[in-house]
Curated annotation (Swiss-Prot):
Residues 1-19 form the signal peptide. This is RxLR effector protein PITG_11507. The RxLR-dEER motif acts to carry the protein into the host cell cytoplasm through binding to cell surface phosphatidylinositol-3-phosphate. It comes from Phytophthora infestans (strain T30-4) (Potato late blight agent). Induction: Expression is induced during host plant infection.
Amino acid sequence: MRLSFIIVAVSLLAGGSGAAGAAYPASDVLTSRGTNEGARTGKRSLRYDSNVERTGEEDDEIKFLPDAEKLAQLAKLAHTNKADSLGTSLKNFLSN
């Protein structure tokens, strides 16, 4: 009996019954955005960081960010050291 229900259900779905039809034809559906709408080429920041609002003290996260030269040294250090000795090397590097 279950097999007959499965056969009927498959035949209705494959036959394109009224229940399987779309509520709106595909030609009536419009997209509200283009493919590149909202894409920006500029740098995005998730924080509100304005020079007017700055009080002179920076966040701890921003204060301790390394500059480009220090990041290049860190990348070179990571490239030359093995994974087991990298932890102590990073501690020594960041403590300077």
